[in-house]
């Protein structure tokens, strides 16, 4: 176990390394360092046993594919179906709870894309960029910075359409940018994105509420 002083020192070093502000005014840190995704909440809003406390979590991203055609996660029939959907440039929205493998499934679909496909990935933490190790696609990764309107998800989605990609991958849609995702689909640019949802039936309502 580590104490609060050690935790604060560790997160301070991470924020300095990634050149991200972490303070009372910027109380949430969400960054990637190598294969580690780190999310921290400042002590100004974090509580443990009713006391102010910095809290953080570390998620280790696997550099090796967790979902493959041989992993048993996808049946042969489903694998063939996804290959047809990718070949036909069909847009897809992946829904599920936190930790259910939405990002890993995105990576699985990315690896099925044609090596000549030009792919633009829009991500907060560049976790999807690791698929380069197992893909021959022309991948361009853009990192979202919510502190600047010029690099928000909405702005980057609109700019991506000017780049005429074969695929636009939005790592996660969380709010009004879902409208830009829909508009992109309507213009013929296929998109793959993820959302948090309880089940498939709740996904249309969830997406509608993001837009409204």
Task: Please give the residue ranges for each predicted region.
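Conserved lysine of the Walker
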Residues: 102
